């Protein structure tokens, strides 16, 4: 089970503390919290009182007290020392793409506790990366995987179990086993997409959630909120969705991968006019940003355009029948 830190210990050391240990949380309240998908302190500590009140059917004042107590017991929300943060960083795992050039570009692989945005034009290979990492996530840790379950939110009807089967066989894996650990839902509009993020939280009990994929993140928002008059509302909704995804990454020590569409800036005087959808909201929410483009001979180019700790750079790889390869 996922564990949370106590105030008496170092900020990120884990020990088994249950929601019943919170002051004022009796059996009835604990049952409501669990029915709403809250099993641990960290999940409560990152909620807002209004959201917790709505999800768990509690009063807002009660919710505020529960959240405050959870933050105190998990020692979240105050200043911490740099060495404590370094200890937290040691918990980060890396999911290998099993493509050496991509792993080298990312300093060893795709980090957990991070939101990775992959953007590019149609046919640049965004969905292929999502499928490949979904397969790889089910691998044992000593083989570059996370030995975890994957949740895949499909907004464009592009998930193909047949492709997962091809990639699994390319790694010598049992396709049925791999598919059993990938949980897929089709999102039909932006509201449904946001609800599915909440559903992941509820379904995570009993599963080792290690990866969440949204393919693609912005397509519904872009189609439903049209024109400058709707831009502020679109960005507000998108920001809320991104925060929910980041919470899932933090609470589960998981990787969130989102694919994104692009548009061309006709007024660009120099450089590449291709820009990702989502504006500054998505740019600030993304921990890492990868820009994919096609190259000659069926090759793809991945460029790391934003990272908190790695230099910009690019690599070349191929999409084959068996999956991604150098």
Model-derived regions, located:
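Phosphate-binding/switch region of NTP-binding enzymes
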Residues: 235-239, 243-326
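Conserved catalytic network of the ASCE P-loop NTPase/AAA+ motor domain
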Residues: 108-110, 141-146, 171-178, 202-207, ...
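A short amphipathic alpha-helix within small helical-bundle interaction modules
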Residues: 19-22, 33-55
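Amphipathic alpha-helical transducer elements in NTP-driven molecular machines
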Residues: 96-99, 103, 112, 127-128, ...
